[in-house]
Structure formats: C-alpha cells, structure tokens
Amino acid sequence: MASINEIRNLLTTARAEHPIVSSAIAEFTQTYKQAREDSDDGIRESAAFIARALQEHARGWLDNDDMIILLEGQRDLARLRANNAQIALGNRIRSTVIRLIDIALASLVGAL
C-alpha cells in the first residue's frame, strides 16, 4: 500500500499543476490516512486500490478517461457494499472510500 508520503507527493504534483485543489488534497490525504487505519479489510483494500490507480495515472499508464471509468466503477461497488453493510460499517465506507473516490474524480474533472 502506498504510504501517506507517497500519496502526498503525488498530490503535491497535482497541486503545482492546479493550485485550486489544495483543500481537496488536504481532505484526500486525511481521508486516505483514515481508510488505511480502518479495522475493515475492504476499506483498507479500497484505499490501496485508489492509491495504486493514482500512482499509475501519475506514471502515465492510465489517462484521465481510464481513471474516471475506474473510479466511478469502484464508487458503485463501494455504495453497494455500504448499502448492504451494518450501519456503522456503511457509514465508514461512505466517509472514507466513497469520499476518496469523489475527491479524486472532482480533481480529475477539474483538471480537464
């Protein structure tokens, strides 16, 4: 799983290109940290997946369209899981995984 510093470095590059996203970057970093430390395997794995996707996007292996499709699919899966989970777990999925995806998507769309 990508470290907090690796994610921060990826997002700092995005901030240099698009200064308006700094508050989104701060929120993403905090939410990513929460997801990595969550007791639920699914939440931790989703955070790792999102981090890997961001790394591959930064390397140029995924373009913006690929990222949007990938993240929207992951968001749909997370919503299904949240809806089928116990209330407390569903709330954590919504506040971490779905929020991470929403921030990443908003940043991508804003960069287009």
Question: Where are the language model's segments positioned?
Answer:
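Cationic, hydrophobic amphipathic alpha-helical membrane-interacting segments
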Residues: 1-112
